[in-house]
Amino acid sequence: MPTAIKTHSPEHTSYDVVIIGGAMLGSSVAWFLSSNPDFTGSILVVEKDPAYEFCSTAHTNSCVRQQFSTEINIRISQFTIDFVKNFRDYMGGSPDVPDLTLQSFGYLYLADNDSFADELRARQKVQERCGAGTKILTPEELKADYGFYNLDDIVLCSLNTENEGYFEGSTIFEWWRRSAGKQGAEYIANEVISMTKSANGQKIETVTLATGDVISCGTVINATGPRAALTARMAGIDIPVEPRKRYTFIFAAERPLD
């Protein structure tokens, strides 16, 4: 049930918030903002690929883990897990909203040297303080439960099978996008090609679209994912974001797994 996306020019020439990028990140911001009773402003979402064919959202595995080295990343993941498990409640409780589950297949990190092993131990302590179920295992301990691994060159293992795994990210994205539209966020198929800043250089005052429209704005949100650095440069900002390939490998076991 896709939301109809307006093409080309927006309805107005001024918005409180302009979100550049309408995929998972942009639609998340649009939904959370439009759902917040304290926010009464206008929202414009500018998406240059309205079919979402080339965005990272369309290619993600939609997986979540808690095995990070910083508390903020762990807490963000834990909020994500709670959101997935209680998706219907977060979206208003309607029976039309699907119930989602988290398929906790777990994440396993293997250290083949003492330096990385020490890093895994340090990370586990942070994760444990945050309530994550990460366990540090010797190769022998891991082998006892997962006998199909060849661990000859491994010195330490970090494993968490609780609240780490896959969820239906595409469903969340579609409901965010559609609900944000119903709550007043305006989606258009267009592209931001430049920005102008205030006299003191501290604020973006307008964005110019590929159609030539110049839009005044209170706040601009960069939600362009791997293209975020290119978008930021329009505002004279350099950020360390770049697209990188990620690979998923699916193995067929030579012998049936126990």
What is the predicted role of each segment?
Residues M1-V17, F32-S42:
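Extreme N-terminal leader/targeting segments of oxidoreductases
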Residues S28, M91-S94, M195-K203, L209-D258:
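Flavin-dependent oxidoreductases
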Residues N61-D145:
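Dinucleotide-binding Rossmann-like beta1-alpha1 core, especially the glycine-rich loop
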Residues S115, Y146-V155, K197-E205:
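A short, glycine/Asx- and small/polar-enriched loop/turn
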Residues L159-T219, R227:
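Helical element adjacent to the flavin cofactor pocket in flavoenzyme catalytic cores
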